[in-house]
Amino acid sequence: MLVTQQPVFRKFWHAVMPLTELAHGPRPFRLLGEDIVLFIDADGQPAALRDRCCHRTAKLSKGWCVDSEGQACGTGAIQCGYHGWTYDRSGQVVRIPQYEPDRKISPEYRTTAYHCTARYGYAWVALEDPIADIPAIPEFDDAGYRTIFQFYEEWQTSPMRALENSFDNSHFSFVHRATFGVAASPKPSKYELVENESGFYAETVIEATNPVKFHAISGVTDPITTRHMRNAYFLPFSRRLDIEYPSGVRHIIINCFTPIDDGRMQLCQWLFRNDTEADCAAQMLIDFDEAVTREDKDILESTDPDALVDTRRRGVEYSMESDRPGMLIRKHLMQLLARHGEAEVHRGMASAVIPIARAA
């Protein structure tokens, strides 16, 4: 599936950038193949515009924010770095330095504005009117949990590949054999699956290695422990993984696999824990999950990002019983496309000659 060729994905909120990244001025991002610029407006809220000035098409992300007097600052309106045309969050040009102060600016002088909001420490963007809300993360406002912003990085793969991998119990003994995978137990545990309108809920218990260096992470000292995994999928590209150890420690990971284009995605990952810094240092948790994440990244970047979604296309990819969560993801994506009059677009179609080479 080529995500940029599926219009319905433009109607969902996507986690685009940590708000801390916008503290010092505008930042560019490519979402579903569309170049946008994000900045913090005069009210302290994130805004997103098409990354093109309507004057001579310079990228607005080359500019800076200005206050109502036109003075450079960290927040406010965004000023083009080429000729100084200045835009508010609606995309309207509100100031042209070359004009006399009382000269009216044509309402046609504008660029495209996108839906943008702040939630859970991120700027979220929908390129068109959203048809669903941002998935809830109740732990973000729960005093019983601490929030750790773990990863914000580009991967050379697609959201579909990352999503399916997130629910795949059969790769642990191989991809993660150096971290938590039990090499002697390659047969995966079975998920109990319950579908819902936004995706599905999947629950299982797995074995995990627990060397001394991981004791603070798990809260137990057994060489082999268990992970009670409560996993949830949210259309189109988000998931929640709630890991509970026998100690009662909860290790909750939220992922948004944000589509950059047809060959790249942005990994956005939050971690929530119901212990304290004294129990287990945040850096230890980041280091542990980073090692696991690097193992996933290495193998996923070797796959074809144009993942098969419509399983009626025979002879492209083959599946086994433990792939059921991935097949359910495909089912929900296909139902979503059908509700909006779409079919899967892929590279094999004559009308979709789209390269997937790495970006320069």
Regions found by a protein language model. Give the residues of each.
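C-terminal catalytic domain of Rieske-type non-heme iron oxygenases
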Residues: 45, 57, 131-360
